[in-house]
Each structure stands twice: as structure tokens, then as C-alpha cells.
Amino acid sequence: MTNMTLRDLLNQQDATKFATDAGTRAHRRMQQITIDGDTVHGDADTVARIKLFPELLPFFVANAQTEVPVAGIIRGKFVSRRIDRMVTNHDKRQILVMDYKTDVSPDKFHNKYYAQVCEYLELLRAIYPGYTVLGYILWLHDFRLEAVQ
């Protein structure tokens, strides 16, 4: 057991609050982004960064939804979640799900984040039978897109 001083505890609390606030700001900025042909909305720097990664563009089309509530039963328990970004293509019978993460060192909570996106996929597959539902984590520190199976 370590002996933490009050100062250590306050510094830890300040760091957590800073990280939470930064994550909230990043999520808000990402919610505003649309890149669909000539239609471009949102923070210019973020849009420019996203455009460097062509694999991200299908997530930022005009019909993309943000902060999408989803709920259902998983392993006998009621689960309610909110999806950061979702694109539904009824013609292709496909749904793309993206969850933003602001961690610079993703290893610490990677399994938790992966499980979170897997829950989204399970809930959506029950709601949209016959659709292919694909999930991804977007690491905002380097705009790396990670597929979740």
C-alpha cells in the first residue's frame, strides 16, 4: 500500500478531470464533422486531419448519426449505451459503428473499450437482423482506426 499525500490525491483528481474535459471537447468537435462530397462542416483542422485518412471518410457522410442511443438485453441483463457515430446504409444492409477514444496510451483500457464496442454490435445486430454491423475504435491521438470483431 502506498502512502498518498493530499497533494498527490488532488493532483490525480486534477489529471482525471483534465482528461475527462479534454475527451468531452474532442467528442463535441467530432460530432460536428461532415465530409460528404462538397459538403464539409466542422472544425477545419479536424476535417483536414480526417481527410488524410481515406478509410475514415465513410464515417463522416451527411447521414451519419452521432450520440445514438441503443438498448437491449445482453446475457440476460438490460443494457443501455450511446454510440459516438453510426452510419446506416439500408441499400447495402450495412451499419458502421465508430467509438472515439482520446487515450494516448490505449493499452490500459483497451479490453474495456473493445468490449464496449462489441456490446454496440450485439445490440444493433438484434435490432437490425440481416444487416452486416461493423464496429471500430477511432484513436483520436493518431486517428488510427481499429476494427472490432
Question: Across the structure, where does each feature detected by a protein language model lie?
Answer:
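Mg2+/Mn2+-dependent nuclease catalytic core
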Residues: 77-149
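Nuclease catalytic cores
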Residues: 1-83, 89-90, 114-115, 122, ...
